[in-house]
Amino acid sequence: ACFFGLIYPKLSSSIVIMSMPFSGTQLRKNKGFNIKKINKNLNALRPAKKHYQLYLSGKSANNNIMNCSQGISKFLRSYYYFKSYDFDGNKPHKLKNYSTKELKKMPEYYIMKNNLGISQTVSKYMPSKAYVKECAWLTEKDLNIFSNSFKNTSFKGPLSWYGMMLDEKEKQQILDLNLSRKIFIPALFVAGEADWGIFQKPGDLIKMEKEFFNNYYGTKIIKKAGHWVQQEKPKETFKVINSFYKKIRKSED
């Protein structure tokens, strides 16, 4: 969404981004986030670990999910639960830097054990039958629609995002566009309080707030929501976004 706003500013009147901050296009200057170096350092830990983005950008991730022993439906259930507010282990906070000491503070869905695929990683966090029955924000009926869809299409499409994000040629093409360092249209950032996406890249939230958005309407953190903020708390999410657009309209009158 931010890249669209930068490339086609005349087609964008406002922007709302969710979960992961966007700190700008100066990719070469983001010296801290060197995914290969980060992953090498994580591999050197004992037990060895790996960064989820590099893993999900690889060829094995889709096969790992599609052929997982628990089945796609249970994979999705545990994955959604693991990254939600409902999982007690999600207590995100600021990280000082990209050192392994700091990064390994994040949950296993971000800093994975090196010998496990994503399906094995999340299988340990399958919620109870009682939880599944009471989970109003992701019913079994809705989950079955998702799982049946992915059975037909696989996860290659969604996973390709990681490959594009980390691809050096793609980064260079973006740099060659000489895009603006700022977005000047009204902007809002929304995330759940239990979402580690806010802090997984140290410093990005502050850079986004102070440098990238030139017409910033604020960071809205929604209580009792995790990574799936629009599913977990749809009414609250709608309320903050609707309020954002009302403020824009009022400023234009």
Q: Where do the language-model regions lie?
A:
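Catalytic active-site module of serine/aspartate enzymes centered on a nucleophile-bearing elbow/loop
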Residues: N214-D253
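Flexible "cap/lid" subdomain of the alpha/beta-hydrolase fold that forms the substrate-access gate
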Residues: F4-Y217
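Alpha/beta-hydrolase fold nucleophile elbow
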Residues: A1
